[in-house]
Amino acid sequence: MKKDSLKKLELEATQEIVIQTFINDDVRRNDALLNFIEILDKIDGSVMISLDAEWGAGKTFFVKQIELLLNYYRHCSFGEETISDLDTAVNQKQRFRSLEMKNTFIPIYFDAWMHDDHENPMISLLYSIIEQGYVKEKFVNQRSLRKGFADVLSGLTIGNVNIDLDKMIDSPNDFFSAVKSTESIKKSLENVFDEIITEHCQKLLVIVDELDRCRPDYAVRILEKTKHLINDQRVMFLFSINKTQLIHTIKKFYGDSFNASAYLNRFFDFEFNLERIDTDLYLDYLDAQRQGHLYSQKLISEMCTYYRMTMREFNIYYQKMQYIEGKIGQDGFSEISFITRLFASIIWALKIRNDEKAQKFINGDLQEELINIFKKVHIYNVYVCRYIAKEDYDELEALCALYDFMFSSSASDSFKTNTIEIDAYHRKEFFRILWI
């Protein structure tokens, strides 16, 4: 990526990119991926599983890789054609190559957030199960499957409108038009699952992603309806969530005094946590050629670690800092490059993690943040000590004095030590570069 250009770094979870991230294992999550699949294969019965991680931590990529590999192993089990690149990658990874699964799975991916404008979440979810079950498995009788789905929908009431079953069966676009009441939802669901599962896999894994981003009423209803209506022993659910945010979402629905944590424990039989990425490894992935200034690369990595950034936050920070590097140049030392690396690195990290603190820092009211970084971020300390002062000067005192000069309204006309001098021109250029 050119240093003076901006490009979205967050990758879309397309099949091609999901395969490539598995092949390269750029963020070292293949071990976690394999461990999850091995555990999943050992679980008996109908269960609801949570995969917990922060927003932007890469949950969608992880569950998409689960979907990819479960399909791969099922195709292998039935002697069906597999994706050549994926087949090559699996055969090159000993643990994945030697994995023997006792069950075959059809994974169904459902983005809850994309459907939270629908009144009845179960209709959206079941529609995804039916359509993906058919689209991925051509052998399923489409008309029979839709007939079973129509029977299920007839038990999910929206208003008082009766469904036209023949129209629904022949016109999939009319699936959401209307429903009528019945007492046979569970039996109808069992029939639907029979159509998908019988002879073609042992289990369905329904992956529900982005639930914590949904409307509170939608998130609550999808949890409750899933638990109460679907208890087929062949069907498992994996909910990809940020548990902390989902707890807030539930409290918005039931009230702040509601014990949302205990409430969630009623639904999830197993809970898995997705570990944070290794920032150094991820930086290697983003900047494989190491074309940038060595200090700036190390600083990005250590600052992301210090502020505990998620993968998405890392992408934003990396993009901004690389762009700034392109503006200050990399040909040796300059006063502008020095103060920009010192302060822009903190300001943009704070803006990503806590915009209010970023504003306090810019206003000159957060010197303690600077002191903490000087003490705890090794490469930052090295850079300060290398350039800001020599001999009789205390580096931390000099750094704090430079901070006051840059961000205090009562600052003097310049900052000077025996190694560097920063004046009003440098300060003006810094703020110009900062907000480009």
What kind of feature is each model-predicted range?
Residues M1-F96, I422-I436:
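Walker A/P-loop-proximal flanking segment of P-loop NTPase domains
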Residues K2-Q20, N24-L33, E54, L69, ...:
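The catalytic "switch" region of P-loop NTPases
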Residues S46-S50, P107, K203-L205:
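Residue-level preference for the first positions of well-ordered beta-strands
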Residues S50-E54, D111, V208:
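Residues at the beta-strand->loop junction immediately N-terminal to the Walker
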Residues A57-E195, Q367:
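P-loop NTPase nucleotide-binding core
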Residues L86-D87, N141-N162, F270-F343:
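Conserved AAA+ ATPase small/helical "lid" subdomain
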Residues V208-C214:
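Conserved Walker B
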Residues K298, E302-Y306, M311-I436:
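C-terminal alpha-helical "lid" subdomain
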